[in-house]
Regions:
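Flexible, glycine/small-residue-enriched loop-and-beta-strand segment within the central core
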Residues: 68-78, 83-151, 177-179, 184-195
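Terminal amphipathic alpha-helical/low-complexity segments used for targeting or macromolecular assembly
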Residues: 1-61, 179-201
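Short alpha-helix at the nucleotide-sugar/activated-sugar donor binding site of glycosyltransferases
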Residues: 103, 156-157
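Short-chain dehydrogenase/reductase
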Residues: 139, 157, 173-175
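Short hydrophobic beta-strand element within catalytic cores of glycosyltransferases
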Residues: 164-165
């Protein structure tokens, strides 16, 4: 028998209000309540253990500042050395895969879920998900929104406030709404930082 969970995980339209999915979201919210409200910031070991339990797969080193929100949790995979600042939202119906050394600014939102444009289908409760993939060494600035089906390439920087509706290639600086590539990131950016911001005795 095909369940709504099976349909969701395979990327097909499904009814999110059905018990097999709503119960999973409730279980996730219970864990998130503890993560966001009960554990103190100083309880680092407990917080790390709980976020690793909430998410489907993580690296050894991970820090997610509270508050954090996701729908299911098990649909999210993050690599080594992941950091998300406060207010991160991951609607992970379609799955989210994040590489190593990824940095999220505050209030970053990833939305993998889509709804039908047709009103009758939408009112029946149908939805579907499309995976978001973020490569290695990516910095996503504050208040960025990344929409369903988007891939962000390695070593890319997404400027604050961007709304990412299409794939962004590797080694790019991308900004705006809708997000567009401003230019490539090169070694000149390293040299600029070293000479402008590093203290030289």
């Amino acid at each position: 028998m095909t369940t709504q969970l099976m349909l969701m995980r395979e990327g097909f339209a499904h009814l999110a209000a059905e018990p097999d999915l709503s119960d999973l979201r409730l279980h996730c919210r219970e864990m998130l309540f503890d993560y966001n409200n009960l554990l103190r910031p100083s309880e680092k070991v407990k917080k790390t253990a709980l976020i690793k339990k909430i998410l489907g797969k993580t690296g050894q080193t991970i820090k997610v500042n509270s508050p954090f929100f996701c729908d299911y949790g098990f649909q999210i995979e993050v690599g080594e050395n992941f950091f998300a600042n406060v207010g991160c939202t991951m609607l992970d119906t379609g799955g989210i895969r994040i590489g190593d050394n990824v940095l999220f600014g505050p209030n970053v939102s990833l939305y993998t879920v889509d709804h039908p444009l047709n009103v009758s289908l939408r009112n029946e409760g149908w939805e579907h998900g499309r995976k978001i993939i973020i490569g290695n060494n990516v910095w996503v600035g504050g208040s960025v929104t990344i929409l369903a089906g988007v891939t962000v390439g390695d070593n890319t920087v997404i400027g604050a406030g961007a709304v990412v509706t299409k794939d962004i290639p590797a080694n790019s600086l991308a900004v705006g709404n809708p997000c567009r590539v401003l230019r490539k990131i090169t070694d000149a950016d390293r040299q600029f930082y070293l000479t402008t911001y590093m203290k030289n005795d």
